[in-house]
Amino acid sequence: MAYRAAIREEGAEERYPALAVPTGASGPNADVWRDESFNNDLAYRGVVGAIGPITCLDALLFAQQNARVPQLERPTEFLASVLRKGSDEREEIVVVFGAGAELFPPKTVYGFDIVDDYVAQGWSYWYVLHNHTRQSNGALGIPVPSTSDVQFVRGLAAKRGLKRVRVTNGFYSFDAGIDEMRALRAK
């Protein structure tokens, strides 16, 4: 994939990319960046969740978004809800993929009505995958939930029974159970 090749060529394939904090942030904006740094520190030290190589399914979903909107040219975010249902004979998964063409798509594209239908049929809301492709300075995205993401997934857990959270930059993914997320700060 061109995205991965370009990142590798730049030498930017880092498991723990530095958070690009804007200089001169003050007031509430400075508080947000302080909380973002706090969360990244917990994740990078392994206190909350784990960061490892992207999984096969997550790479496929990231590639789907990259095929829709080239992530090097125009970074965009997506959210994929992964549900599962198992029996003694087999385990099944369903993916509800929501994205737009803009950097921050509206939550209306995330397909939560479909997720709700599956949950009502006995499927478990196994995990949500979200992406952070590139930072504003062009560096590889942070594979850690932002303070806004933390607040959002807490709501999904409370309302829909979400079990886990993953955040990927196309190379590495953060993975944590909802209970672990209590230590992270939210916006």
Language model segments and positions:
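Glycine-rich short-loop/terminal segments
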Residues: M1-Q121
